[in-house]
Structure formats: structure tokens, C-alpha cells
Amino acid sequence: MSQEYTEDKEVTLTKLSSGRRLLEALLILIVLFAVWLMAALLSFNPSDPSWSQTAWHEPIHNLGGMPGAWLADTLFFIFGVMAYTIPVIIVGGCWFAWRHQSSDENIDYFAVSLRIIGVLALILTSCGLAAINADDIWYFASGGVIGSLLSTTLQPLLHSSGGTIALLCVWAAGLTLFTGWSWVTIAEKLGGWILNILTFASNRTRRDDTWVDEDEYEDDEEYEDENHGKQHESRRARILRGALARRKRLAEKFINPMGRQTDAALFSGKRMDDDEEITYTARGVAADPDDVLFSGNRATQPEYDEYDPLLNGAPITEPVAVAAAATTATQSWAAPVEPVTQTPPVASVDVPPSQPTVAWQPVPGPQTGEPVIAPAPEGYPQQSQYAQPAVQYNEPLQQPVQPQQPYYAPAAEQPAQQPYYAPAPEQPVAGNAWQAEEQQSTFAPQSTYQTEQTYQQPAAQEPLYQQPQPVEQQPVVEPEPVVEETKPARPPLYYFEEVEEKRAREREQLAAWYQPIPEPVKEPEPIKSSLKAPSVAAVPPVEAAAAVSPLASGVKKATLATGAAATVAAPVFSLANSGGPRPQVKEGIGPQLPRPKRIRVPTRRELASYGIKLPSQRAAEEKAREAQRNQYDSGDQYNDDEIDAMQQDELARQFAQTQQQRYGEQYQHDVPVNAEDADAAAEAELARQFAQTQQQRYSGEQPAGANPFSLDDFEFSPMKALLDDGPHEPLFTPIVEPVQQPQQPVAPQQQYQQPQQPVAPQPQYQQPQQQVAPQPQYQQPQQPVAPQQQYQQPQQPVAPQPQYQQPQQPVAPQPQYQQPQQPVAPQPQDTLLHPLLMRNGDSRPLHKPTTPLPSLDLLTPPPSEVEPVDTFALEQMARLVEARLADFRIKADVVNYSPGPVITRFELNLAPGVKAARISNLSRDLARSLSTVAVRVVEVIPGKPYVGLELPNKKRQTVYLREVLDNAKFRDNPSPLTVVLGKDIAGEPVVADLAKMPHLLVAGTTGSGKSVGVNAMILSMLYKAQPEDVRFIMIDPKMLELSVYEGIPHLLTEVVTDMKDAANALRWCVNEMERRYKLMSALGVRNLAGYNEKIAEADRMMRPIPDPYWKPGDSMDAQHPVLKKEPYIVVLVDEFADLMMTVGKKVEELIARLAQKARAAGIHLVLATQRPSVDVITGLIKANIPTRIAFTVSSKIDSRTILDQAGAESLLGMGDMLYSGPNSTLPVRVHGAFVRDQEVHAVVQDWKARGRPQYVDGITSDSESEGGAGGFDGAEELDPLFDQAVQFVTEKRKASISGVQRQFRIGYNRAARIIEQMEAQGIVSEQGHNGNREVLSPPPFD
């Protein structure tokens, strides 16, 4: 079928006409234009150049370039959000044109006009609805100009709700005009879709999937045809039967599941084993179920059947005999594993009457049951009616797999293996029917199905399938096996029986975890006691046998042959029982032995998942814990007296330690100790300790060849000098050659020496795996008050140490005391130092971190939950701002707002003719009217034609340093001088580079956050640079802010707190700048980065660069020094105003020179002050430091001093700043990052643990070449015009400041400094009472 379809639909390439070529090419271009337009609309950015935006300073962000930006801006301005639908409409029109390009219909101009009217109505109403109900997009109206006009027209007349309804009505009419669809049709379509969805959902919920589907039934029929042979019936009958079955199954899906098939089974008179549903085979040989001899409801066939055993002339026992032959020949349905038994041949069918009868007992294999037979006593006679070949029905073949099966044991075990069938009427017992059914089950193939039959036929049918209630049921003995080889057919059970049985079995599987399976009642009931099925007890077995008694003798031989054949594949073994049901037996291969009730034992994994530990597991854990305790327990090596002595020594040591911590060092000296007694006690103690050590190592046995113990071997002079001091000094342990001894399996006990008895040192014996090198001295962190004692934590508790261990705590060993064995320099005692005092010179070793830079975990993390922005409150504030501006006769509209962590900026669109200066002058009045602390007016917003109004938030958020440092802008910046400032009003981090500033001036009043901002910048560089990259010179006049950084390896010198030393440090920076410029000039580079690259290149070439300016007398170096990498130098001055007030004008020139020239040399200044007045921040300093940061200041004058413009006086404080970056005149408002003192101390301690600072000598010291402490009598400190001024004064013989000022055209201050320098040199005299000076130097030589 598919081949024919392919041949009919073969595609051939046909050429288009010229008109169609042009049309398709044009359509393709239009579609591409629509795609480009959609990309331009989606990537629209307000800062791009467009019709409403003409000035920009950034690259174009729009994907469509400049045309895309212009077109997107125009469409948004006209249509608003409806501009996004324009590309979709264009693509739809192209598709419509391409689909109807071949239609030659005449154009209906009236219809075209109606469609045009509908399109216009849709566009206008859509824009109007968007303008009324949707939020604005960017700075455009949501409906564009069209929507704004409609909304402003309709709202005064109909309000927003009425306008929306009116526009919806017009939109509906426009849709009908444009598409030609009736709304009735649209409603019907919508209703039909909804009903289809509901119908589909309801059918899905009512569908029953508890049994197999129709396809599975069809597969079952095909499978049975393949395995059991072709059914002998006409094709018409099979088609009719299949149609009836499908219709019945379709009807059963929509009826009550609990009552399904009930009426048909009870009142229709049909047999549930009719051919229309079930086929019957016996070991692969087909048998007719409608045989007149074996049916209980009719005696004649409705039609002639050539395979009828009565009409075709074949003997009635042929099907049974054929089945027996098939069983013995192939055993195709046998279990996978069968026991090998000695069975007689099949030929011996005639047996004497003395042979016992057998009960046909089905035995399951690993997956399915295999029916086998076992001998039974004569007490179970078989009725002749059950030996007829009509029992070949394969009902069990079609029933589902069950987890268990009934077993019926015979009364006594007989040695014979041949079956015997007694006459039926001799013993009419109720169990005979059940016994006969067991026999019949051997004729049906049950290899792939469970042999238990859990159904009963109604009373109207022959009780051939009546099964007894098993004595012991096991519904959850093992999981229900999944049959994949043969799909099960429909069982002859009522549907409610199937559902209830399956659900009950699932419930029992879930409930039966640890309880044994209960035994059912011993009554002949159906499997489920809750179900009532017709019983066969009402029909006596004798009457049932009499119905077919004439045929009993003819079938007996066939039955015996079949039973004999079945014994070939079944083990002959049975249990003795007194006529009742036999107990539950074990299933499997071999003899079936009795066993107790079956209980499902959970696995270890299941028990562990429920937290239940098996006894073996608990015992193993107990043994492991006992072994761990015994690892340190060496009680078998010591007697009770020794253990008591060790405990007393430990108690005495702890008491002595407590007293020493309480009273200090004098506690040991207060105890009078005689020298002779002390020596004797020391010798005795050493002897005892040595004996104990030998006992620990060698279990009390003296090794062969060992030298005897002698105190003379351990006497040396250092110990005698330390006898009176005791072990309370933190001394190191000398290195002793260890004695290689085998490791003991159990760690020795700990025994502490009493500190009151100074003793001689003893030799230290260590295990081979222990390190011989002495450990460094550590102080115990739990006891910082008494650091005299030296503690060393044991690393390997198994190996014994020379110290003594405590037997009471084997799991957590106590710190070990080490004996002093050699005199060392006494360590500084800080017993009297309070733990809260700062230890600037603290040399205690710290744990060295493994990371190259400090971890962000040292800083406080920001809160995980951030309070959302209240847009409703912002809208209310925007309306309030408009109202307050209208009170001052300023018409402005709030078009946008940008909420930040501290403030919110409202963008005002002023009316034509309104100046921004008017709002700036009203800043205080607006703050008063809006009930806020301060209002800052931003007259120019870059990239926008609006005026900004910054108002503080009601709830201020804290900006944490960690969240700013953990940012891509900071991480990706390669500069080691990268600093973070905080966040801007939009919440974006602000990161600056000190190398590009290149100097920074910070000003702010007390409490404005200036010191916190400086700390944030220092921590930023500490998180970014190594000490070899950046070095600091910190000047802190207050000795509070920067002194905390004392001891970090980045410092060039100690934190400078004396202002005279500060002037020397600045002077050293000037000299260092000059030296670096000389070196860079010799290497031909322009900045410090290029210089370091040259040095690195020389190192890679393995040819270091020698210092070109070194002379042999310059230093004590024996060899020519080479150039090394130079770090950046950052000079931080915390209180610049105090420095200026203390030193005066002496440092102004130094700062000015550094600000002018130090950038290329890698020296940068950071000056912070509280008072940004003109006498502190002079014009000379401001001119060379373009980068400024202004925190809150007191007045506009101070704001203009620091920023050259107002605005800093209206800041909110607590880190709120204005940052004026390099090459920018517009300041940026930044909310500074908050840094706690604990975070600063944590980072400082982290860097202290990494290494000690390498201070440079001579930075703060005075030298003759430098002219003293801040003096100007050195040649390098004189003014460049000093020599010319001296010549001018000596020639004119008149020394006046005004004369020097006029002659050289310099400032008054500079001229005054030159005259002062002349006075210091002795060229002119001091100023007289009249203000004149005398020239003391002689005139120049002519």
C-alpha cells in the first residue's frame, strides 16, 4: 500500500511562470523582513539612537542596527505593545497570498472594503484596549499614540470599564468583517472543543485497565492458533465469534465494573466455556468442548461437526490417548527443571486392582506450575465420570497466574507407582470431585500458567471446574510472576471476582511483611470468602456419576493410560494423612517435603531501609566499639596499684595546673624544695618512668643485649640550670635519636608528671612511624590566660610518645607535656596581657591557609531573602510627586522610576518651557512637602531627556561587601588595584580601578561612612593582590582606623602615626618615584607594567638585568645587583586634614609632586578627610587629583569644594556617596558596601597567617640627605627657582616677597617659601620690625 502511494505521489520539478517566480521571491523577502523586524523589536533598547533619542554614548544594542532601532522606536511610539504583532501579521499575509496565488477568482471589491474596515477596527480597538488595561512599555504608552488618543477620548465619557466594553464590541465586529466568521459559528466551535475535551477526560477516568486490552485478546487468539494448531471451525463462524466478542468487550467498558458479566453468567443460560470465547486443548491436541457425552446442558449438536467423536467413527478415547502420547513424547509444557525419577513404561496400562489410586497434584516450577501425580491410598476412589476425555478443557490455560496453589495429600504413602481408579459409587465423599478435578488438570497444558483454579461454575453447569477451598492459602508467598511467553486469555471468572481478587492480592502483598500468612477456614468455599458462588454440594456425586455411567467403562482404560503417561514426568511421592487435606508442602525440585508456614523474610537491605539492625550487625558494631576501647586499654600490662598511682599523678598535675593558672608563675617558686630531696625524687621518678616505659614496650621483658638503666647517661648541665624553674616555661624539646622498636598493638597509658617535682629529662622513645623532628610551640586555644604550658596534640595515638598518657580518656587524649631538655631563649611572657588588648607584635604561629587569597567565607553573607519592591507604593509616590510639583506651578509627569537598595529615582518629563533649575531650587521644599529626609535633583540623566528626582526608601537595604566582591566585574578585572565601592541606584555593583584614577580624594563628615568606604577599598585590594603585587604605606593620625592592618605582609613599613614620620614617608615615596623613572627610562618603557614585563622577559631568558645606576660604594653588595619586579605602592592617608594641620605646608608640595608624576611609577594616593575646606584641599592638590568621592557633607560649599558642584549635602549618610570617576563630570550615586570590624580583623588575621611583612628600612627615618624631619635645607627640597631668586636678590640687594613674585611671575605663597628658604640658608636675615629684610650674602662676582 505504501509503495503504491509513493509511486502515485512522486514529486517532479516543474518550472514556474515569471509572475509566480516574482511573487514567491517577493514573499520570501517579506518574510525575512518580518523576521528582522521581530528581532529589532525584541532587542529594543531605549539608549539606542532613534526618533525619540538622538544623543548616545554607547554602542548600539539593537540586533537590527541603527535602522532597526529607528523602526522599532517608531512602531512602539505608534502602536505600543501591538507592534509585536506586526511581524506575525506580515508572515500570515504572505502565507495567505502563497496559498491563493493560483486562484483565478474575480476580485470582490465590496468584500475587500469590508475586510479593510475590519482591519482598521481591529488595529484601533487593540491599541485602545492595550492603552487602557496594559502597563506602559519602556517610556512609550502601551497602546502607542493611537491607543493614547482613544483612551483619552473614551475615559472621560465612559470611564475605563465602559471604554473597555465598547472597544471589545467594536473589536468583535471588526473580527467578523475581516474574517467573515459568524460569532454563532465561533461559539459552536468553542463549545464543541470544550465538550470533546471533557468527553476525552471522562472516558479516560472511566476506562478500566485492570485487565488486558483488545489487542492483547487478539494477540492471545493468534498465539493460541500458533501453539495449539488450527481450530477446526469455519471461517464464517470465527469472524462472527470475533465480532461478537469485540462488541461485548466494547460494551463492558462502559458498565459498572463490579457487576460486569454477572447477568450474562447467571441468567443467559450460556456456558462460560463456549467456543466464542475459549478454546480447549489437551497437551497441544484439540478437543471439542460441546461433546454430548461431556456437556451437562444439551444432548445434541446444533449442527454437524465432522470432528465430533460420536459421528466421525473415531473411538471416544482417542483424544485422551493422543494427549497421553503427546505428554510422554514431547513434554512440551513441562517445567524448566524436572526431577529424574524411575517410572514404569507407558505400555503397562493394565494394572491389578490392588494398586493404589493417585491424586493428581500440580507442582509449580520456578515460574509456572507443572502438574504431576503422586500415589494416594484407596480411600480416595475416583468416579468414572471424571475420567472421560471431555476433561481436556483448557480453562486453566486461560486463567491468570496465581501466587499459590492448593495441595491435597493422600492418606498414606504407597510404594507402587501405577494409578488405580476405584468404582465411583463406592465412597461418595465430597472431596472426590476435588480429587477428580486434580486428575483432570493433568490433561491441560499448564507449563506457563499457575495451576491454582480460583473460580467456580454456576449450578446450571457441569461441576467439572468446581474447585475446593484450599486448606492453606498463601496469597503473598512470592511475587506474582510475569508471563511474557504466552499472553493470558480471558479467564472464566466473573469480572467482580477478578477485580476483587487482584486488589485483595495487592493489599495482602503490601500488608504481609513480617506476619505469617493466616490459614483460611477449612470449608469448601470459593477462594475469597467474601464472594458467594454457586456450590456443587447440592448435586450428589453419585447422581453426577450416573449421568454418564454408561460410558464409564469405556473411558477407564484411556484414563489409566493418560495417568500412567503423566507419571513419567512427575515424581512419585506423597505424604501420609488421615483422609484430610495435607499440610502445606515445599514447592520446587525433588521430593515435596512438609515445612512450616511460609513467611516472607525481608532482605537485609529492606531491614536497613527501615532502620532495623540484625543481631549480627549489632554484634559487629558492639565488637568494633569494644575493640576501639580496648585499643587504648592496657590494663593487662599494669596492676591495680600502678593504675591508682597514675590516676593520683594525673589529679595532682591537673590541680597544679589550675593553681598555676590562678596565681601565675610565682606559684611554683613559693614551694620550698630542698636540693637533695629534689635530686632524689627526680632519680626515683626517672627510674620509675623508665621501668614503666620498658614495660609498655616490651611487656615487662628486658630485651636481650639492652644496656642497663643509669641516671648518669642522662645528666647534663642544661637540666641543672633549669631545675629551679620547672617545666612551666614554653620550651622546645631537643631532638633525640629514636630507638627502632616494633609497634605495640595497644597504645600505652598516659601519665602526667607532677609539676612540683623538677626532674631530670628522660630519653624519648618513639615508634618508627612517628616524626623525629620536634613540633613547633603551640598554645592551647582553650586556655589563653595561661600560655606558659606547652601543648602538643598527639597525631597518632597508637604510637607511644615520651610523655605520659591518661588511661581514663583513651578516645580523646589530653595534651602532652614535654620535658625541657636544653636551654633555649625564654619566650615573651604575656600572662599579664589582657586577652582583649591588641597584640600588634604578637608572634604566635597561626594556621597557614592553603588558598592563595582569602576566602569569601570570612565576610558576612547577605540575607537569602530580599524584600520585594512595592510597586503600588511607588505608583502612589509618583502621583504624590506630580501633585507636589503642581503645587509649585511646575507641570511634570513621572514616566518611570528605578528602585534601588537605598533610594528610588523618579524620572520627570517636564512640560515645555520648564527649566530644571526651578526644581533644583525647590529641593528642600520638596523634601518638606514629601516628608522625606532629603531630596536630590539630577538635572541631566545620561541618555534620557528627563530630570531625575531621588527620594529615599522607607526601608533601607544593606549592601554587603561579600555580594559585591562575588561579582563578575570584580573577578574578571585583571588589575591588582581593583576596588569595589558598592551598588548604584539600580542595584548594580560599582567597581573602580585605582590604577586608572590614578589618585583618589575622599571627603565626608563624621558618621557618613568614610572610614567604612576606605576599609572596603583596602579589603578589595587584599582580596585581589598578593604582597609582591601591591604594597601599602598607611598614615593614620588618629591611630584607630588603619592601625588594625598592622602586621599584614602588604605593608612597606609600620602604620605611621607620627606626622613627622608621615612627611618622611611621603619624601621616600618621591625618591622612590624618581628612582623608578630612571630605571624605566633605562629600559625604554612608559609605565610600571611595561617595566615588570621586561623583568619577567629577562627571567624567562635566564639573563637578569643588572642595575644600571649602581656604584660599588652605594651598598655592601659584593656582586652587581640585578633589577627585580617592582610592586604598586598605595599611600593611604586617613586624616589628611590633621596631617595638614600638624605638618603644615611641608607635605603639600610632596603630595602635589606625587599626584603629578607618580602614576606611571606605580605610586597612588588615597587621601581621606573629614573637613573638605579650601585650606586643606588646596587648588594645587585638587588640580592633580581628578577622582573624588564625596560622602555626606555639611553644606553646599563643602560639596563644591570636593566635587565642584552641589549635591553631597543632600546625601543620606551611612555609606551614601557621590563618585566622580576619571574623565567624567557627572557624579554617580553609589551606596557603599558595609564592612564590619569583625570582617576586617578576620581578613587581617588570614593575611598574618600567610607571612610576615618585609619592611623597608629608612622610610620613616631622618637622614642628612633628606634634610631632617620635614625640613627644607636639603638640595632636593629647594624650589626650582631658588638659585635664580638668590641671584636676583643678591643683585638687587633687596629681599621682598612681592619683588620675587613679580620678577618670576609666581604665586605669593611660593615666593614666600623661597624667601623662607633663603632665610634658612643664611642668605637673608629675619624680618625686621618694619617688615624689611637685609641681604646677608655678598653680591655675585662680576
From Swiss-Prot:
Q: Where does ATP bind?
A: G1007, S1008, G1009, K1010, S1011, V1012
Cite a single GO MF annotation: DNA binding
Q: Which GO terms describe its cellular component?
A: plasma membrane
Give me the stretches of Basic and acidic residues compositional bias. Answer: 619-628
Biased-composition ranges, Polar residues, are 437-448, 690-699
Q: How does it sit in the membrane?
A: Multi-pass membrane protein
Transmembrane stretches in the record are: 25-44, 75-98, 116-132, 163-179
Q: Which InterPro entries does the UniProt record give? A: FtsK/SpoIIIE/SftA (IPR050206), FtsK_4TM (IPR025199), FtsK_alpha (IPR041027), FtsK_dom (IPR002543), Ftsk_gamma (IPR018541), P-loop_NTPase (IPR027417), WH-like_DNA-bd_sf (IPR036388), WH_DNA-bd_sf (IPR036390)
What is this protein's function per UniProt? Essential cell division protein that coordinates cell division and chromosome segregation. The N-terminus is involved in assembly of the cell-division machinery. The C-terminus functions as a DNA motor that moves dsDNA in an ATP-dependent manner towards the dif recombination site, which is located within the replication terminus region. Translocation stops specifically at Xer-dif sites, where FtsK interacts with the Xer recombinase, allowing activation of chromosome unlinking by recombination. FtsK orienting polar sequences (KOPS) guide the direction of DNA translocation.
State the oligomer form and interacting partners. Answer: Homohexamer. Forms a ring that surrounds DNA.
Which family is this sequence assigned to?
A: Belongs to the FtsK/SpoIIIE/SftA family.
* Protein name per UniProt: DNA translocase FtsK
The organism's lineage? Bacteria, Pseudomonadati, Pseudomonadota, Gammaproteobacteria, Enterobacterales
